[in-house]
Amino acid sequence: MKKLTKKAENLLLLIWVQAFLALAGSLFYSEVMNYVPCELCWYQRILMYPLVLIYGVAAIKKDISFALPGLFMSGIGLLVSTYHYLVQHVSIFQEVGGACSGSVPCNVIYVNYFGFISIPFMAGVAFLIIFVLHLLILREQGRKA
């Protein structure tokens, strides 16, 4: 285990904050606003929620190697979010999006801030931030070696 630089520690904490905010945001929309998550939303939650624990433990232990699964989960989450966003906003994908097996079709748009920011967009940005910051930590640690 390599000791993290102060910059890497701060980035790791920032990743944890981002994952926590994404978790809190998704719970706000489902529990406070009563928006029922669709099937693709559940997949994104399955990929995001553990990141709070993974990066939290990594930050406490100051060991980025513990968080390696988070890199893969955030990358996969970014792909799922991108697909979900396309299902909501691109006509070719919208026809497919209604085929979600849950009680809520995946092409339902609960929020649409500024005409393009939907829940999958916000999730995708969160996954992207986590993924990029994790790569920056790995790069920072590589420089230190």
UniProtKB/Swiss-Prot annotation:
Gene Ontology biological-process entries: protein folding
Transmembrane segments: 9-28, 43-62, 69-86, 115-137
SUPFAM superfamilies: DsbB-like (SSF158442)
InterPro entries, A to Z: DiS_bond_form_DsbB/BdbC, Disulphide_bond_form_BdbC, DsbB-like_sf
Pfam families recorded: DsbB
Membrane topology designation: Multi-pass membrane protein
GO molecular function, one term: protein-disulfide reductase activity
Keywords associated with the record: Cell membrane, Chaperone, Disulfide bond, Electron transport, Membrane, Oxidoreductase, Redox-active center, Transmembrane, Transmembrane helix, Transport
Family: Belongs to the DsbB family. BdbC subfamily.
Purpose of the protein: Required for disulfide bond formation in some proteins.
PANTHER family according to UniProt: DISULFIDE FORMATION PROTEIN-RELATED (PTHR43469), SPBETA PROPHAGE-DERIVED DISULFIDE BOND FORMATION PROTEIN B (PTHR43469:SF1)
Stated name of the protein: Probable disulfide formation protein
Organism listed in the record: Oceanobacillus iheyensis (strain DSM 14371 / CIP 107618 / JCM 11309 / KCTC 3954 / HTE831)
Designated gene of the protein: bdbC
